[in-house]
């Protein structure tokens, strides 16, 4: 099922910065928020408890990649935090992903990173020594993720349709790198607008700087949300 709220990437360096940002929104508004490495390492698990206590949904974006037993144990801890979604690197392999699923349980969604949206095909071929196309690599990882019993993948919107064809229509495609028209793309190599992401079949979208660095973050959020959901029935 598609998520109507764009996920806001809380790419802030401190707990206080998050509090200041969220204070801009009405207290009764439930948001879907992404906590990444920078914020999690700065603020610790308490940031998740704080956000959940405010009634928000949390995507904990730590991209775990380690031996299966270590990942399983880490996921058990994350499940106790009450996260709504978290992720691993598909490159860790099927056994690692299965261990992650077992550790996390079924209450939260578990997705895998295929190729980062900052990765170009040339970079992948040179530094990862993967001598296929970028799309072929993404499809391969998506199939292995489905085989491991995970809920979906993080992927570029350009890859959504081929991933759903290679797996199944209900396989979640979470798309970062979303930028409204006219907004700088930053360090993302593969980007798309919210409306385009909807049309192509993305289930979740993640938006960071176009909201967090906007002159009016609340207005920017609602404009992106409106664009994302404008064609929903």
From Swiss-Prot:
Catalytic activity: orotidine 5'-phosphate + H(+) = UMP + CO2
Subunit structure: Homodimer.
Function: Catalyzes the decarboxylation of orotidine 5'-monophosphate (OMP) to uridine 5'-monophosphate (UMP).
Active-site residue list: 63 (proton donor)
GO-annotated cellular components: cytosol
Keyword flag Electron transport: no
GO biological process, one term: 'de novo' UMP biosynthetic process
Gene: pyrF
Entry-linked InterPro entries: Aldolase_TIM, OMPdecase, OMPdecase_AS, OMPdecase_bac, OMPdeCOase_dom, RibuloseP-bd_barrel
Binding annotation for substrate: 11, 34, 61-70, 117, 179, 188, 208-209
Keywords, comma-separated and alphabetical: Decarboxylase, Lyase, Pyrimidine biosynthesis
Protein name according to UniProt: Orotidine 5'-phosphate decarboxylase
Domain of life of the native organism: Bacteria
Gene Ontology terms, MF aspect: identical protein binding; orotidine-5'-phosphate decarboxylase activity
UniProt-listed Enzyme Commission number(s): 4.1.1.23
């Amino acid at each position: 099922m598609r998520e109507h709220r764009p996920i806001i990437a809380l790419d802030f360096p401190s707990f206080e910065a998050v509090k200041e940002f969220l204070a801009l929104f009405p207290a009764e508004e439930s948001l879907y928020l992404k906590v990444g490495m920078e914020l999690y390492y700065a603020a610790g698990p308490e940031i998740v408890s704080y956000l959940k206590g405010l009634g928000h949904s949390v995507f904990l974006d730590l991209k775990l990649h380690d031996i299966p037993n270590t990942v399983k144990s880490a996921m058990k801890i994350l499940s106790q935090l009450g996260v709504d979604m978290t992720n691993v690197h598909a490159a860790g392999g099927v056994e690692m992903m299965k261990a992650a699923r077992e550790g996390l349980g079924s209450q939260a969604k578990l997705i895998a990173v295929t190729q980062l949206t900052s990765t170009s095909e040339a970079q992948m071929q040179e530094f990862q020594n993967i001598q296929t196309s970028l799309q072929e690599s993404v499809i391969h990882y998506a199939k292995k993720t489905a085989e491991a019993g995970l809920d979906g993948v993080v992927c570029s919107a350009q890859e959504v349709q081929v991933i759903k064809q290679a797996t199944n229509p209900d396989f979640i495609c979470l798309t970062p790198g979303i930028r409204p028209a006219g907004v700088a793309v930053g360090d993302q190599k593969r980007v798309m607008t919210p409306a385009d992401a909807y049309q192509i079949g993305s289930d979740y979208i993640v938006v960071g700087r176009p909201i967090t660095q906007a002159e009016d973050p609340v207005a920017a959020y609602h404009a992106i949300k409106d664009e994302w959901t404008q064609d929903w029935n």
